[in-house]
Regions:
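Solvent-exposed, conformationally flexible loop/turn segments
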Residues: 79-84, 162-166, 181
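An acidic-aromatic substrate-binding cleft motif
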Residues: 197-216
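A short beta-strand micro-motif common to beta-rich folds, especially ectodomain repeats
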Residues: 89, 182-193
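Short edge beta-strand/loop segments characteristic of extracellular beta-sandwich folds
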Residues: 86-92, 172-174
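Surface-exposed binding patches on compact interaction domains or structured appendages
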Residues: 22-71, 94-171
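Sec-dependent signal peptide recognition
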Residues: 2-9
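C-terminal motif of bacterial Sec signal peptides marking the signal peptidase cleavage site
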Residues: 15-17
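Short, surface-exposed loop/turn segments at beta-strand-coil junctions that are enriched for proline
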Residues: 94, 174-181
Length: 216
């Protein structure tokens, strides 16, 4: 079922006007079938408004738990010219965050530059699934517990985060085939209404090798 949300624009005194946040369509995610423990609730009580940490792109993270991964302040990925490389960071909030937006800056090395258009930072959505079992190759048993797992990479440009939730953000960088080799620095700025800004430094090392196109 689709849900339409409209961010309200607060009218502040002594202002000439205000910008209305865009309307967007999205779906309502399922409730987490796994009950939140008292320990988790206590951990959320220590979390402020909006936080961000880099995390492994090879791991899945619960929507209902405070991230326990040893978060990194800087993410560095590498790839050939023409290669698509990815990374993941986690946003989490104890109080909720309205109108979360991620903006990628240009990539700059010592003597070259790549446009921010080569990159995207997209919100990961959660869906219900079966708990993974390496021995299960059949339909789900009625006794098999369901889990809420990160699954869909959405195209939404703006997102509302509920209180006490974690939201993965999937970062993709398409390295141009004509890129100059070197280490490029960028930054993803995450902003939300009343939450300030969260800055996620990102470095991409372009290796002096060319990945052939599918035509080749």
């Amino acid at each position: 079922m689709k849900l339409t949300r409209l961010f309200a624009c607060a009218v502040l005194p002594f202002m000439f006007g205000c910008n209305t946040a865009p309307e967007f369509n999205t779906f309502t995610e399922a409730d987490d079938p796994v009950a939140v423990t008292e320990k988790s609730l206590l951990a959320w009580n220590q979390v402020g408004r909006l936080n961000g940490i880099w995390a492994s792109a090879d791991s899945l993270y619960s929507r209902s738990e405070v991230p326990v991964t040893p978060g990194q302040k800087l993410c560095r990925i590498e790839g050939w010219k023409g290669e698509r490389v990815s990374a993941q960071f986690l946003l989490y909030t104890g109080t909720g965050a309205e109108g979360v937006v991620c903006k990628v800056s240009d990539f700059a090395s010592a003597d070259s530059r790549m446009s921010s258009d080569i990159a995207s930072a997209r919100f990961v959505r959660y869906t219900l699934g079966d708990q993974a079992s390496p021995t299960c190759r059949c339909d789900r048993s009625p006794y098999s517990p369901a889990i809420l797992a990160p699954d869909l990479i959405d195209t939404l440009k703006v997102f509302n985060m509920d209180a006490r939730t974690t939201r993965p953000v999937w970062v993709t960088v398409n390295i141009p085939q004509d890129a100059e080799p070197g280490v490029y620095k960028s930054e993803i700025t995450v902003s939300a209404k009343g939450c300030g800004k969260v800055r996620m430094p990102l470095e991409v090392e372009v290796i002096d090798q060319v990945l052939p196109t599918h035509e080749d």
